[in-house]
């Protein structure tokens, strides 16, 4: 039986999803970007893999510490926000200075005119991403995205 942490997070889903235990279908790095340019996505994944041995953009579940921090992703009538918890062996990747990495990379592209490997790497270095296996160490008032590397997760209604 899987032991889940008592620390809860929130996630928006595009369509209704049942409560209970689910598998992370992206654990093998199969997630493709929805809005971010593929090349930037791959550069970012490579950086995270070199830093933490995890393709954070392609294999994690994106969550927030508060319902309001994920509500902007639930703007369509079919979307739903759920409370989500993770096994105690999960890894949590985040930066206290980043709310949404996609928005930050989009801003970087507008400022620089183009995205390069060097500019993306420099941006990520400056963001001071960190990894923890202790979800309660993440400040409860942090409103940014958290990328969770896990095989399973548990959903509950909010």
Language model regions located:
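Extracellular structured ligand-interaction cores
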Residues: 7, 58-60, 81, 143-145
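A structural signal for short, well-ordered beta-strand segments and their strand-loop junctions
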Residues: 11, 62-64, 83
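Active-site and NAD+-binding cores of ADP-ribose-processing enzymes
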Residues: 14, 85-158
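Short catalytic/ligand-binding loop motif for oxyanion handling, primarily in non-cytosolic enzymes
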Residues: 19, 70-73, 91-94
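Extended catalytic/binding region for NAD+/ADP-ribose chemistry, centered on the ART fold
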Residues: 51-74
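"Short basic amphipathic alpha-helical interaction patches in structured regions
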Residues: 74-78, 97-100
């Amino acid at each position: 039986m899987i032991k889940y942490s008592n620390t809860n997070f929130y996630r928006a889903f595009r369509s209704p999803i049942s409560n209970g235990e689910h598998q992370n279908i992206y654990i093998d790095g199969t997630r493709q970007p929805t809005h971010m340019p593929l090349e930037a996505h791959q550069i970012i994944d490579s950086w995270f893999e070199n830093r933490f041995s995890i393709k954070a953009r392609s294999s994690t579940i994106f969550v927030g510490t508060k319902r309001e921090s994920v509500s902007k992703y639930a703007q369509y009538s079919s979307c739903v926000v759920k409370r989500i918890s993770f096994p105690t062996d999960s890894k949590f990747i985040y930066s206290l200075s980043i709310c949404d990495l996609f928005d930050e990379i989009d801003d970087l592209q507008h400022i620089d005119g183009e995205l390069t490997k060097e500019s993306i790497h420099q941006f990520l270095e400056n963001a001071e991403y960190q990894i923890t296996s202790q979800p309660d160490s993440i400040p409860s008032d942090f409103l940014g995205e958290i990328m969770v590397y896990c095989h399973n997760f548990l959903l509950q209604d909010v």
